[in-house]
From Swiss-Prot:
Splits dipeptides with a prolyl residue in the C-terminal position. The keyword Metal-binding applies. Mn(2+) 1 binds at residues 257, 339, 384, 423. GO terms for cellular component: cytosol. Disulfide bonds: none annotated. Mn(2+) 2 binds at residues 246, 257, 423. It catalyses: Xaa-L-Pro dipeptide + H2O = an L-alpha-amino acid + L-proline. The gene is pepQ. This is Xaa-Pro dipeptidase. GO terms for biological process: proteolysis.
Length: 443
């Protein structure tokens, strides 16, 4: 297997090429990319957890260090000023020496405000990309060159196409997340609370709560009907019925985003519905290929949802086509089939149709879909269908012409289980689709 160092060398070459093209197009000399800064809680001296600028960690796997700066021009070796203060109050990361440091010039930056004296004197034609525009102004960057939309759109568009280095990192993140999911299922089977299941997950993945790429969704029973449930009850419920876990991991700044759902019992209607959603999810992935719109796969899954609603007699006396046409599947799967994945969990450029940033919105019928792209080789996406029993979405259907088609008794029986979601992370290749999650044998 090719080493991470050689993959990274090629990755940097790709980023340099993209940078040259962007600088030429937008008539800039270089980009100054800021890792970010710590921000204190209001009226306090305690900072919020640091989250690095995604455009910064695209270049270097430095995710925990604020006040760092990258200068890139697409030609010369990228220059990294790495924040290295003399500080006995806080942990100070040492100057990095790793697989990637041969391809980047790494320079110690002892003072956060010392970058100004180290940058080129002529800065009028340098673009700043980062979260603190006032810092850029202090450095003499032109206001029009601070987070220039055209440059960011261009870089975002091409971030959709992962390099081999990025895919290698994402496969490592998958391994960590899969370990966590196995530990969490074991904790669920042993009767633990949501809080303790989360601890088991974090321990297995080697993450802190602030390290995971998004807040873990650890939902027992009816909590699985809350799409982004993050409360974490300390007390286990008296009766364990179901468990939905949506939790990821991060490796060198790249995310995994997996979801699994388990039934406490294997012989009830809910357990069969979990199995059927899983089977339909795999069947959809088996049809995926480059050159097809992601929207088409979302619509196709609503047809599969209709099939399951009919099979389980949740909707009766109506054809599957009529269910989809009249959006009776909508309240059961109110979110999109998935989203782009990469340096960010909901990765950028999901609606971008070209490198000029042309936007194609989600269909009006499915406004929460996060991607309208034609699938192309190098893209990484989640496929995460679900079926839920959410009263606020079902309530409008209790009246009107379609109410009689809903098996309300069956729905009431399933509501205590909350819902179901199954999520894998897939890579689009020229002639196949790689399922990174199932390749690790996560059922």
């Amino acid at each position: 297997m090719e080493s991470l160092a050689s993959l990274y060398k090629n990755h940097i070459a790709t980023l340099q090429e993209r940078t040259r093209d962007a600088l030429t197009r937008f008539k800039l000399d270089a980009l100054l990319i800021h890792s970010g800064e710590l921000f204190n809680v209001f009226l306090d001296d305690h900072p919020y957890p640091f989250k690095v600028n995604p455009q910064f960690k695209a270049w270097v796997p430095v995710t925990q260090v604020p006040n760092c700066w990258l200068l890139v021009d697409g030609v010369n070796k990228p220059k990294l000023w790495f924040y290295l203060p003399v500080d006995y109050w806080h942990n100070v990361e040492p100057l990095p020496t790793s697989f990637w440091t041969e391809d980047v010039e790494v320079i110690a930056l002892p003072k956060a405000d010392g970058i100004g004296s180290l940058l080129p004197a002529a800065r009028g034609n340098i673009g700043y990309i980062g979260p603190v525009p006032e810092r850029a102004l202090q450095l003499g960057i032109e206001a029009s060159n601070i987070n220039p939309k055209g440059v960011i759109d261009y870089l975002h568009y091409y971030r959709s196409f992962k390099t081999e280095y990025e895919l290698a990192c994402m496969r490592e993140a998958q391994k960590m997340a899969v370990n966590g999911h196995r530990a969490a299922e074991e904790a669920f089977r042993s009767g633990m609370s949501e809080f303790d299941i989360n601890i088991a997950y974090l321990t297995a993945t080697g993450h802190r709560d602030t390290d995971v790429p998004y807040s873990n969704i650890v939902a027992l029973n009816e909590h699985a009907a809350v799409l982004h449930y993050t409360k974490l009850d300390h007390q286990a419920p008296e009766e364990m019925r179901s468990f939905l876990l949506d939790a990821g991991a991060e490796y060198n700044g790249y995310a995994a985003d997996l979801t699994r759902t388990w039934s406490a019992k294997s012989d009830n209607d809910y357990a069969q519905l979990v199995k059927d959603v899983n089977d339909e999810q795999l069947a959809l992935i088996a049809t995926m290929k480059a050159g097809v719109s992601y929207v088409d796969y979302h619509i196709q899954f609503h047809q599969r949802i209709a099939k399951l609603l009919r099979k389980h007699q949740i909707i009766t006396d109506m054809s599957e086509e009529a269910m989809v046409e009249n959006d009776l599947t909508g309240p059961f799967m109110p979110h999109g089939i998935g989203h782009p994945l990469g340096l960010q969990v909901h990765d950028v450029a999901g609606f971008m149709q070209d490198d000029s940033g042309t936007h194609l919105a989600a269909p009006a019928k499915y406004p929460y879909l996060r991607c309208t792209r034609i699938l192309l080789p190098g893209m990484v996406l989640t496929i995460e269908p679900g079926i839920y029993f959410i009263e606020s979405l079902l309530a409008p259907w209790r009246e009107g012409q379609f109410s009689k088609h809903f098996n309300w008794q069956k729905i009431e029986a399933l509501k205590p289980f909350g819902g179901i979601r199954i999520e894998d992370n897939v890579v689009i290749h020229e002639n196949n689709v790689e399922n990174m999650t199932r390749d690790l044998k996560l059922a």
